[in-house]
Amino acid sequence: MNYVKKALYDEMLSFYHTTLGMEHEDRLRLRGQIGHLVRVARKEIPDTLETKAKIHLLLQLFYGEWGFHCDPESYFLSSNLYLNDVLETRRGMPVSLGAILLYIADKLNLPLYPVNFPTQLVIRAEVEGEVAFINPWDGQYISQALLHKWYEGAMGFGMTLTPTELAIANVGDLLGRFRQLAKNALIREEKNDEAFCYIARLIHYNPEDPYEIRDRGLVLAQMGCYHVATEDFQYFIDQCPQDPTALLLKNQLEELKQDTYPIH
């Protein structure tokens, strides 16, 4: 299947470059780190093995020998989304660990693909007509029964899990998930400069996206630039009047309009 498995990895690179100003030396260091993992994987996983065995060995390497993991105590920190931090500490969240795992799998020609599941990123393995699902949190296989429990927990009791929810992710939806997680983390940590730079890049490619403009308004409000923030909020309310966020912002808009601060 022709699928851009490294799209998520590339977005992590872009996130790092946009928000922290990745230098040439940083890029070379990251290339060396990920290249080393690929070389080790190629050495440790014999090409003569069947595909299922190769996938199993890759998971053992990634989560066992290399020690990639998720820490529930620091799950939503932005450091879990920065490629340099994840490669250095071997700690991330499902979307970032999954991005690195998919990148390596692509280099090894292994049939692993992302699933944009409601609760988190899930990895889908397709081998000779069989399908299995892997939790990028810890590399364990996930049963259909457990996936159904996750789905009910997210969508409501009695909701039916359909093949659509388990299909290979649309790249645009996948990148959208990463971008929202990244924005949320930066805004929550009040890393306003980084958040503003990242959102500005996203708006450059989608200048009329009301959700990106809303998020820019949230950052501007945190920076004290209320006058400019209200313009973004008003645009979002006009474009998405039925969105629950629009109703909340509408109630706060008049209060914000009373404060006018210049951008500085």
Swiss-Prot record:
Species this protein is from: Pasteurella multocida (strain Pm70)
Pfam families: TPR_9 (PF13371), Transglut_core2 (PF13369)
Family affiliation: Belongs to the UPF0162 family.
Full protein name: UPF0162 protein PM0557
InterPro entries: SirB1_N, TPR-like_helical_dom_sf
